[in-house]
Structure formats: structure tokens, C-alpha cells
Amino acid sequence: MSKLHDFLNEAGIFYLATADDDQPKVRPLGAHVEEDGKEYFTVGDFKEVYRQMVKNPRVEIVAFEPKTRRWLRYTGKVVFVDSPSVEEKIFQELPHLRQMYNDETGYKMKIFTLEDATAKILDMQGNVEELELK
């Protein structure tokens, strides 16, 4: 597992920042999986966050790990992917999502990763650890 993935697991909940025209929007997320050294996330196709990312794919993910009092900044460009294996991994880890994303509801899960990305772990003393991303 990568340091990025481990940090997100430790934090549990992380926050995704997008732009709605000139207004920043931030919301909590928790779904993520790692495959082939890349981190993948998911949002619903029926949500504003999805439309915001389509319009402006530059986003930032921030997570805070309370035990160490460190936080993660993961910034990059959203790229949506069609990956049945990642989708299945997400459903295995979060089976309740099958109740939301299915043919009956008509809602689709949109899977994304970040490209041209940087990731840093920071602490309150100003220390910065740059993470190597695949």
C-alpha cells in the first residue's frame, strides 16, 4: 500500500474541494481504493460535485489524521475512468453503495483518479513530506 492510501485509511474521512464557478465547495468523502499504485475515488453522476469536476477538473483532497495531528494535501486534475475492477473493489469495501448505484435507481458511480498530481503530508511545525506518486 502506498503512503497516500495508508494516510487516507487512517484519516477515515477526507474532504474534496471543487469550484462552482468562483465559489469553492468542500464536502466529506470516504470511498477510495488503490489499484496498480493509483488511488481511485468515487462520486455519483447525479450530484453537483460530479458536474463541478466535469466543468473544472482541478481539485484538492485534504485529510486530517488526529493521532499524529498531520494532514494530507492531494492536488491534481480529475480523470474519470471506466474500470470494472475498481468498481468491484469499491463495492466490496463499501457494500451499501450497491443500494445507491444500480439499475433500479439509475444512479451511476463515477470513478476518478488524479493526474498531474502532488501529495504532501504536513504538520503543525511546518514540516512537509512530499509523497512520490505513481
Where are the language model's segments positioned?
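Hydrophobic/aromatic beta-strand elements that line small-molecule binding cavities or substrate pockets
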Residues: 29-32, 76-78
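Short glycine/serine/proline-enriched coil/turn segments at secondary-structure junctions
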Residues: 23, 68-70, 122
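Charged, gly/pro-rich active-site loop segments
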Residues: 73-134
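A short mixed-secondary-structure module that forms the rim of ligand-binding clefts
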Residues: 32-68
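Acidic-histidine catalytic/liganding microenvironments
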Residues: 11, 56, 94
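A short, Trp-centered hydrophobic/proline-enriched beta-strand micro-motif
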Residues: 6-21, 59-63
